Amino acid sequence: MSMQDPIADMLTRIRNGQAANHVSVKMPSAKLKVAIAKLLKDEGYIADYAVADEAKPELEVTLKYFQGQPVVETIQRVSRPGLRIYKGKNELPKVMGGLGVAIVSTSKGLMTDRAARLAGMGGEVICYVA
């Protein structure tokens, strides 16, 4: 069976891995998944990520914990294949009053909601992380 929404699968694997206190989670790799993992690392939500170049590339995300609790409290898919959500530069959401981040796909690539606001760009809201 084919996977309908690989980004939602990635977010679910991270959510489930942290709920089960796993050190890392593995998933099939894709450029968009690697870009999301890079943003999550830059924002401090995951410890690290690595791409294993084999016959089938695999992305391994090393999860991050603080005092035994997962750093990621919520990770939620917003725009999905059946219902795309686009926001203009003035409509970009603030997650948890600015404590979390929204990952936005813009014409300049993936960036956080803060970076998109500074660049004066809107785009497709991929997910919320807090």
Curated annotation (Swiss-Prot):
Gene Ontology terms for molecular function: rRNA binding; structural constituent of ribosome
Alphabetical UniProt keywords: Ribonucleoprotein, Ribosomal protein, RNA-binding, rRNA-binding
GO BP annotation list: translation
Coiled coil (UniProt feature): none
Pfam families hit by this protein: Ribosomal_S8 (PF00410)
InterPro entries recorded: Ribosomal_uS8, Ribosomal_uS8_CS, Ribosomal_uS8_sf
Keyword NAD: no
GO cellular component, one term: ribonucleoprotein complex
Function: One of the primary rRNA binding proteins, it binds directly to 16S rRNA central domain where it helps coordinate assembly of the platform of the 30S subunit.
Quaternary structure note: Part of the 30S ribosomal subunit. Contacts proteins S5 and S12.
Family: Belongs to the universal ribosomal protein uS8 family.
HAMAP family, A to Z: Ribosomal_uS8_B
UniProt-listed PANTHER family: 40S RIBOSOMAL PROTEIN S15A
Protein name: Small ribosomal subunit protein uS8
Organism from which the protein derives: Shewanella baltica (strain OS155 / ATCC BAA-1091)
